[in-house]
Amino acid sequence: MLHAYTPPHRFLPYLSWTDIAALPDKANTVIVLPVGAIEQHGPHLPCAVDAIITAGVMGQALAALPAEVPAFGMPALVYGKSDEHIHFPGTLLVDGVTLLNTMIALGESVYRAGFRKWLIVNSHGGQPQVMEMAARELRIRHGDFTVLPHFVWRVSNVAGSFMTERERRLSMHAGHAETAILMALAPDTVHMERAVANYPPEFPKSLSTDGRPAAAWTARDFGDSGVIGDPFPATPAQGQAILDSLVASWVEGITDLHHLQWPARDEAPPRLA
């Protein structure tokens, strides 16, 4: 079904337009948009990794919310700016301008429906800047619109406790954490018999304190597998622990956003030259 991991009663498109029009306190109702990508994740994981993670985490967070916290999920936006993986079959992408315009149009739709709190939870590392640009544009247009562009992993979670020091520093794609959480969310899509480990070359400390590549890159630059990290230590139990910790943090985050009273302005935005 379209709602995937989100419970039907928390899924915005399952309401009629009259239901949405009649919702109380829409100014403090949190609308959640999971944003992912369809792109290669090595030979052992499906191309839908990012879409699965953001839909799974946020869907389960919405399911775990206290009943008194008003929040609804939108269908996940599964296509993203994935051109760093363009050399691999299965990567289905849109360009940055298309994604930016799509995000702005969706935000305008959320605002037009009367909602004033929009949480964008992205899981693909190649597009946070696009989410931020869309959020800023919407805020310029609407001074009472609280738009929060976020990253699904950038809340308190236990993933790092399972990783080696090298994995924490250099893993970026299809490594330990993503493999483990897929074992919990979609175990039938994980094929560890095909897994490989692969790390990028370390960057000079003067330009990157943790050694992570600071220059522009594509996944093909680091080898033929598409993997950037070590998936081998991942286990289903670790994946469930990571998932549970992310869900708990996002329940807290959605609740706090519901209560947040962000500054608002009512003047028209100035015209840009």
For the regions a language model picked out, list residue spans one by one.
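Extended, histidine- and acidic-residue-enriched regions that form the cofactor-binding/catalytic faces
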Residues: 1-117, 125-273
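Conserved SAM-binding loop
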Residues: 120
